[in-house]
Swiss-Prot record:
It is a multi-pass membrane protein. The gene is Or5p79. It is found in: Cell membrane. This is Olfactory receptor 5P79. Belongs to the G-protein coupled receptor 1 family. The lineage of its organism: Eukaryota, Metazoa, Chordata, Craniata, Vertebrata.
Length: 316
């Protein structure tokens, strides 16, 4: 049943996910579409990771971060999609209490880590364009590892705050989550305890990450733009712009979607609209699937490395 009664207390052992639709035919259609998207997401990001590892010309800080961004994108999509695909095939979509907490935490971890990685990549572009003579020392292997570890630690700390909040919530009976995965807001609505302090802490944690990473990105690109405008060479300007366009596109897609879902006032759109937007964010239509396409189509070094690897396979 998903609900256990112990004296005067009611314990929720599982949650019912209301999902996107109850229509059996539409469920099959959505299952097929989302499965295809998920397979493209995983294969595209794995290909990006493999290409960077085997191509010596891509062994630079920028692509070091890109390979980890691809890993995080797989994590973002995998934290939700497999369970969602299974539930499309079941008459009753459920997730265990523990599974819900894990899903919430993994989504927060990978989403937060992606924010930090995008900020680290912006800083890398800043150093490459604004301080080219100091780039090799300022972006040494040690510095890159420190930025990477810091990104994962930041993601872990933010995820920990959400996980601790979730397991502190009291659920007194209602266990129907009006979403297709365990997102924080629908779970808060089901809780019967006073969560005001926890909500403030979690909002502060998530808000701080957005503010800090956006500031790093904005400041980095402000200096980059100033430096580019001072360049006298048209070729130099074009090369600098081409270096940044892929990252700027990924940043715009990521923060634009996150802002629409989690920052805009809830009264400005319905829960159903929020669920549809979350599909774009979590499943891959907006971020995990697009990132490999963005970097492969807009980045000449990635395209050239791919051509070289394909040529080796053809003539080997």
């Amino acid at each position: 049943m998903g609900i256990l009664k112990d004296g005067n207390h009611t314990a929720v052992t599982e949650f019912i996910l209301l999902g996107l639709t109850d229509d059996p035919v539409l469920k099959v259609v959505l299952f097929t579409i989302i499965l295809c998207i998920y397979l493209v997401t995983v294969s595209g990001n794995l290909s990006t990771i493999l290409l960077i590892r085997v191509s010596s010309q891509l062994h630079h800080p920028m692509y070091f971060f890109l390979s980890h961004l691809a890993s995080v994108d797989i994590g973002i999509s995998s934290s939700v999609t497999p369970n969602m695909l299974v539930n499309f095939l079941l008459e009753r979509s459920t997730i265990s209490y523990l599974g819900c907490g894990i899903q919430l935490g993994s989504g927060a971890f990978f989403g937060s880590t992606e924010s930090f990685l995008l900020a680290a990549m912006a800083y890398d572009h800043f150093m490459a364009i604004c301080n080219p003579l100091l780039y090799s020392t300022k972006m040494s292997t040690q510095v890159c590892i420190q930025l990477l570890v810091g990104s994962y630690i930041g993601g872990f700390l933010n995820a920990s705050s959400f996980i601790l909040s979730f397991f502190s919530f009291l659920f007194c009976g209602p266990n129907k989550v009006n979403h297709f995965f365990c997102d924080f807001t629908p779970l808060v609505e089901l809780s019967c305890s006073d969560n005001s302090v926890l909500l403030i802490l979690d909002s502060f944690s998530a808000g701080s990450i957005i503010v800090i990473t956006v500031l790093v990105i904005a400041i980095s690109y402000t200096y980059i733009l100033i430096t580019i405008l001072k360049m006298h060479s048209t070729e130099g300007r074009h090369k600098a712009f081409s270096t940044c366009t892929s990252h700027l596109t990924a940043v715009t897609v990521f923060y634009g979607t996150v802002t629409f879902i989690y920052v805009m006032p809830k009264s400005s759109y319905s829960t159903d609209q929020n669920k549809v937007l979350s599909v774009f964010y979590m499943i891959a239509i907006a971020i995990p699937m697009l990132n490999p396409l963005i970097y492969s189509l807009r980045n000449n070094e990635i395209k050239n490395a791919l051509k070289r690897q394909l040529s080796k396979k053809t003539f080997s």
